Amino acid sequence: MEGNKSMQREKIDRPMKRGPEQNSLSPPLAKCPFMSCSSLKTLHSLYQGSFPFYRLPSEVGHFSLDENRQYHQDNRKLRYYSPPVGIREKGSPGWNVMDGYESHYVRRNEDEKEGLLHILTWLEKNRGVLGAHVEGGSKRPIDRDFVTWRGHLTKILCTPYETQEGWLLAVTLFKGTFYISEQETEAAQKKRKERSLEQERLMYSGYKFESYICADSPDRQPSQSAVVNTNEGFCSVLLARLTSHSLLISGEVDCTDPSAKKSIPPTCYIELKSSAQIRNPHQQRSFNRYKLLKWWCQSFLLGIPIIVAGFRSPEGRIVSLETFKTSDIPHLVRGERNSWDPAVCMNFCNKFLSHIKSVVTRDDPRLVYLFAWEPGCDVTFTVHTDPEYTILPSWYVNSVN
């Protein structure tokens, strides 16, 4: 999202800061740009109620991205959970997750915006998997209402409780299917460009943590001296349903558990996380409010049942491991002051998807509806035909046509 933008865009992208007086998870009041009758409110109290129907995802495919970020229709980059014996739970391994930052770290180029590229590549190579759906006398080549990344849905789920970072989501309706792709806001780009060395090292530490407990095959041990290359990844492609909305979701999977009782994906997958060591009640409350919210959203959406977290000392060493069951996380925060409610997250997501269906009415691969939100505001949208906003490349459009 480069170049000159209107004053409206500049207002959308202005970051909001959490001050010490903001103890509630409710977004602060803000002066919001271009409110309209087609806007969607995000106040969490509006979405309280029973948990909506969500059919847990079933995996229909997968793909790998190699060290050069090239797509492969296989599982060559799937890793296997292999923690050292004796420290699977509550251990103190002492791993140095800053080790290798200067010499064994290959960063993905974050200036190259991939959008939906890899999902669309999978769809183009697996057209027969989804079949065709007859609706109103016409066939949909992709038998899903929505196609998107897990990370985009995570942002939507967290919106009622988010107090700092806004988002931009581009939506195109093509052949009866809505494609959702995140656009980087100017505030997010500025934040990324201005990361400190400490922030860069903390990002690295999460990847390095994974290298201590993941092996390349079930019969191998983790290689602690391996190069950390963030170009690499294994992604699952899954089908799910939220009330009336059928979804095709793809998300990166950290590893699979070869000892899992159920070996069918995604129930055998494990999400790996690292976080700062919790040393006092204030840090525990902050962890429960913000980290556990995002962790739950990420894992629940893909149907990943287990999260293994490594807690990091100020010196950069893993001092403890803890396993969380995704289904238990909402119970851990229930009853806490200013806590979050998973039903609110899912109800808002359901409403937002319905909102998209109500306003994105023109079926045109060149047309983009850009939904914008910042804390304290309603979700609004603008419509664009400029090529810079296009999210469906011509090769994909031609393959579907």
From Swiss-Prot:
- Reported EC number(s) for this entry are 3.6.1.-, 3.1.13.-
Q: Which residues does the annotated region (Disordered) include?
A: 1-27
Biological process according to GO: mRNA catabolic process; NAD-cap decapping; nuclear mRNA surveillance; nuclear-transcribed mRNA catabolic process; nucleic acid metabolic process; RNA destabilization
Q: Does the keyword Nuclease apply?
A: yes
One GO term in the molecular function aspect is:
5'-3' exonuclease activity
State the compartments where it is located. Nucleus
The residues listed in the UniProt record as binding Mg(2+) 2, with positions renumbered to this chain, are 210, 252, 254
Q: PANTHER family under this entry?
A: DECAPPING AND EXORIBONUCLEASE PROTEIN, DOM-3 RELATED
Listed name of the protein = Decapping and exoribonuclease protein
Source species, please?
Xenopus laevis
What gene, per UniProt, encodes this protein? dxo
